[in-house]
Amino acid sequence: ISSAASDVYKRQAYVVADYCGGLLSPQAESCQERVRIFMENLNLHLQQQGYLDTVLYDPSGFDMEALTTTLDLKEVVYRLLEYSWFREIVSQNTYTATLPDGSTQIWQNTNAFLDPTSEYYNENVCGIKTGSLSDDYNLIVLYQQHGKEFLICSLGSQSDSSRYDDVNFILKTIDESYYLTQ
């Protein structure tokens, strides 16, 4: 995401949080109060859904104080993988969404494992997500091999390329596993 696109995304997230906070608490008078109410309710919802180690502070997701665990990430991804529309979207290098007004929005997946022109392209990777904040580079990969699916959560790699190298090491181990071929 470019800096300008990131700023637009952040503003949109705050507009949605402000609106939802107003629905949750019509008496809230300021945008700041409505966003706070939204975030409190979002965190309560996460707890009720069983994501006990996740706390979010910024509706945009650009939050250096947010906390989560690989266990919570795994649970979220497993729930989402139950939906074919989710699998379809995250498995593509680019995805074109048709919006309610009939216009289209093209999303570029930043997962280099899905890009046929990338040195990291791997036809057995079924997608999911990249992410980075500050100097932490993260990657969640769904991998199919030996008739099985593997969910790999790699957090805190040192660079964009090292996150792919880190996961490639795991993929190679899966590919070469005698145990998994039995």
Protein language model features and the residues they cover:
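Single conserved hydrophobic/aromatic residue that forms the stacking wall/gate
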Residues: 1-5, 9
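Penicillin-recognizing serine hydrolase domain
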Residues: 18-182
